[in-house]
Amino acid sequence: PGAVLTDVGSVKQSVIDAVGPHVPEGVHFIPGHPLAGTEHSGPESGFATLFRDRWWLLTPLPGTDEAAQARLLALIRGMGARTDTMDPAHHDLVLAVTSHAPHLIAYTMVGVADHLSRVTETEVINYSAAGFRDFTRIAASDPTMWRDVFLHNREATLDILGRFTEELFMLQRAIRMGDGPLLHDYFGRTRAIRRGIIDAGQDTAAPDFGRAQRADGKPDG
């Protein structure tokens, strides 16, 4: 009794539905999600600054014990993370935008390159420009984990993919019609959003997504 139970999964509502009914009386279940990590998995992929200045979201349930939540927050902040709280369903929608859909799109882009018969696998590997390398880096992520993420955050992911498809069709029409002003305006607006991510301290303007490689091969920061 009095123990605090949390998790670090990328989907919250399904975890609450699955775990919540089985939490023993007196145990404080406070779901969480650190927005940190790389495309690599397992304990060997950890490093000392993994959580430094990264957001760690908590999705506490109604009636969560304030003292228990304070203890968990102290632990998280002690690892250098920033904290915030969020409704579980809203968390899943936000992460569908910022993480889940981007991973699925990255997997798809690699799949397109793999199935394009006029471009060989060797050419894709040898001549990858920075855009392809940077954009598809996350396609190296663990397939088992991401299969489960998509299946357990199905509705939010499908919602965002539908919106993405509409935007893509709009850009497709603009390119087909030679609508340069529309493209320039669109890219300008989205560029400003990207700069906002840097200004918020969630990345840097340095190459390689702001993760310079250290001598041991792990990302620095």
What is the predicted function of each stretch?
Residues 1-44:
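Rossmann-like NAD(P)(H) cofactor-binding subdomain of soluble oxidoreductases
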Residues 12, 33-39, 62-63, 89-90, ...:
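Glycine-rich beta-alpha junction loops
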Residues 20, 47, 73-78, 189:
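Short, solvent-exposed amphipathic alpha-helical segments in soluble enzyme
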Residues 26-68:
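Active-site capping/gating segments
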Residues 50-137:
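Internal alpha-helical scaffold of NAD(P)-dependent oxidoreductase catalytic cores
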Residues 121-190:
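Interdomain hinge/lid region at the active-site interface
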Residues 167-168, 172-221:
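NAD(P)-dependent dehydrogenase/reductase Rossmann-like domain
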